[in-house]
């Protein structure tokens, strides 16, 4: 009877790893309790490799990036800052900066992936090797590109990926923003 109660508990409560029984078997009452297994941290809320930040209020929001100075980003990207926001779904909040155009002037995404290969997949999505110039510096590798549609700099080291997009065509600007992010977060 105790075995049946424990088996029933296990089957009916998916995802729980243990059951114990207590009660008076003599009178036929059995109670079962379950304990949850310790869970590993969920990295970046299990977001897909190609996840982009979502800022509901758009450029009318004014939430500062916790690891990049607003004026520094404006000076580095060469545009006045009129809005900024963060997406806390990412372990390190993704930061989005706006100037006058509707599209962001800069987007910074730091991904903490479960494996090095997953981080490489993030970089390959943002800066595909077939369309970007390779980057390999201080253990960070990836790609960079700049053209009239904008620039990208995406690198990874171990299971961490850093991706920066800009509406400016110079890839030096996104490189500087990525390096400042890496420095400020001690990555």
State each model region's role.
Residues 85-89, 116-153, 187:
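Short Gly/Thr-rich strand-loop-strand
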Residues 162-176:
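A short acidic/glycine-rich loop-to-helix N-cap element
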